[in-house]
Amino acid sequence: MKALVLFSGGIDSTTALGLAIKKYGKDQVIALSISYGQKHDKEIRAAIAVAEYYGVEHLFLDLSKIFQYSNCSLLQQSMEEIPEESYAEQISKTNGDKPVSTYVPFRNGLFLSSAASIALSKECGVIYYGAHADDSAGFAYPDCSPVFNQAMNEAIWEGSGHQLKIEAPFVNVSKAEVVRIGLELGVPYELTWSCYEGGEKPCGKCGTCIDRAAAFQANHVEDPALR
């Protein structure tokens, strides 16, 4: 069976890619990177580097027009600044009543639906994506939750005529556990990019930089991307 991996070039999707390659072999794995109108292309460039490292087929899709009406702080047209604080701090300000400002409206739903069409066309039987438990905690990113994953899996399974399913290996584990798994796999974290800003180096202040640093610290390992 062939696998398609939703692949951003960050820690989570790169670890998911590593797992898929371990299970199916690189010749049976396709990486799909999706542009959604984000403020920089650092993630895409990282994705290209990692895909080349593994030697997998790499596809690209542009969904930026779908998100042109959103004011999510990650997007080019947004007037909002990307928050320089942890997700926990952001959630505390809203009591968890709404997602964080870096939540792109229903992004994972659109990504998975688009990936399903491509996966079926490429004769894949499974879609991997790297949502983890920390993302859905406190309603920060509701399209990363186990409930969302189950609903999308059922929709894609039925809509594909029982030919395609979702594999979300980290949906019930923390980012620290994702990094632990990746370290065991020998994932090239030095090639990945997580920061929401597009600077020469990671800002170290945005929510995803803070989460990334904590995940490596929990594993008592220096982040290789910062060496």
Located regions from the model:
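ATP-dependent adenylation/nucleotidyltransferase module used to activate substrates
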Residues: 1-186
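Short functional micro-motifs and their immediate structural scaffolds
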Residues: 25, 188, 211-214
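Short amphipathic alpha-helical interaction/hinge segments
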Residues: 160, 217-220
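A short pocket-lining beta-strand/turn micro-motif at the edge of beta-sheets
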Residues: 162, 189-191, 202
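Short, intrinsically disordered, charge-biased short linear motifs at domain edges
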Residues: 182-184, 189-198
